[in-house]
């Protein structure tokens, strides 16, 4: 199971102050990680499935400038942080 506190702490350490980060888990083991750019108020959402360990992003999220120029190059870092935060 993903330790939300640990994941948030590690993601914040890596991405603050560029993005504010929120994590929310549903009852199916899927956690939504929201990266909000305070300058533009745009939110980019990633999904992490604890059952398959897959990190996904919807095509409409990939089109956002904040993803293309702010997060895209860091997807491997994000996946590693999430995997390291599993218990």
Regions found by a protein language model. Name each.
Residues 1-32, 57-71:
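Negatively charged, low-complexity tracts enriched in Asp/Glu with abundant Ser/Thr
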Residues 15-16, 20, 35-37, 41, ...:
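Short, flexible coil/linker elements and helix-boundary hinge sites characteristic
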Residues 30, 41-43, 77, 81:
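N-terminal functional modules and adjacent low-complexity/disordered segments of proteins
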Residues 32-51:
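A short, structured beta-strand/loop element
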Residues 48-87:
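C-terminal basic regulatory modules in eukaryotic proteins
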């Amino acid at each position: 199971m993903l330790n939300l506190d640990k994941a948030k702490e590690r993601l914040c350490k890596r991405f603050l102050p560029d993005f504010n980060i929120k994590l929310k888990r549903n009852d199916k083991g899927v956690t939504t990680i929201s990266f909000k750019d305070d300058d533009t108020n745009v939110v980019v959402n990633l999904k992490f499935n604890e059952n398959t360990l897959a990190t996904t992003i919807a095509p409409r999220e990939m089109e956002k400038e904040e993803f293309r120029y702010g997060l895209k190059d860091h997807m491997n870092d994000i996946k590693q942080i999430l995997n390291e935060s599993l218990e």
